[in-house]
Amino acid sequence: MPKGKKAKGKKVAPAPSVAKKHEVKKVVNPLFEKRPKNFGIGQDIQPKRDLTRFVKWPRYVRLQRHGSILYKRLKVPPAINQFNQALDRQTATQLFKLAHKYRPETKQEKKRRLLARAEQKAAGKGDVPTKRPPVVRAGVNTVTSLVESKKAQLVVIAHDVDPIELVLFLPALCRKMGVPYCIVKGKARLGRLVHRKTCTSVCFTQTNPEDRAALAKLVEAIKTNYNDRYEEIRRHWGGNIMGPKSTARIAKLEKAKGKELATKLG
């Protein structure tokens, strides 16, 4: 083969004109000019973004958020931390189902009852005083006096009472007096039970004979979860959970310390 000449390979036949795709050119209207936006400072109006983080929330919302964060960050003593251990859903459902039977009467029901009694008296049938039906007793003062007099059969405390100091002493008092107690979610649910907005605590004092077995079963389960575990609960601190920034900073420092130690040891 002579010097300077390159070997030529076989040429591939060009594709037929039918197989070639004809690209249609996009018709651009010259009247429409491109005006790209500049989102720099002091330039175009910014696009809509999620600015939830920068919203100035109402004061009560800010306080709620600060409170919840502080509960996580600070070391929470066992007396307060025990209110995070609410009753399990299944037992709580059974408890509220039973408590629903012993709801106190509303103002309208009381009015109707007294009106019927007054009509009966006016008709000359005589006034026969009716026996007070067994109902759940509500309110921290009422519950406290019933526990102290050992008339309470079961005490139910809300987990989110604010200020918590209102019910802080109740678990210790119940244990001292040998009364079964439990902590449930939340004060609004207890409030609905007794026809109020919120309620700190309720207690059972009397029940009908047909419900005594159900109450005894509940009391047994609740005693196992709360009264019998008191020593364990009083040793368990809460909180002390750092945020992502603090955790990252601590991890960075630990890594630097480890590196320094490794270089020293060689």
Swiss-Prot record:
Broad class of the protein's primary localization: cytoplasm
A family per Pfam: Ribosomal_L7Ae
Compartment(s) where it occurs, according to its Swiss-Prot or TrEMBL record: Cytoplasm
Residues annotated as signal peptide: none
Gene3D superfamilies membership: 3.30.1330.30
GO molecular-function terms, A-Z: RNA binding
Keywords: Cytoplasm, Ribonucleoprotein, Ribosomal protein
Biological-process GO terms, alphabetical: ribosome biogenesis
Region of interest: Disordered: 1-21
Regions of compositional bias (Basic residues) in chain numbering: 1-11
One Gene Ontology cellular component annotation held by this UniProt entry: ribonucleoprotein complex
Similarity comment text for this entry: Belongs to the eukaryotic ribosomal protein eL8 family.
Function: Component of the large ribosomal subunit. The ribosome is a large ribonucleoprotein complex responsible for the synthesis of proteins in the cell.
Subunit and partners: Component of the large ribosomal subunit.
Protein name: Large ribosomal subunit protein eL8
Organism per entry: Ictalurus punctatus (Channel catfish)
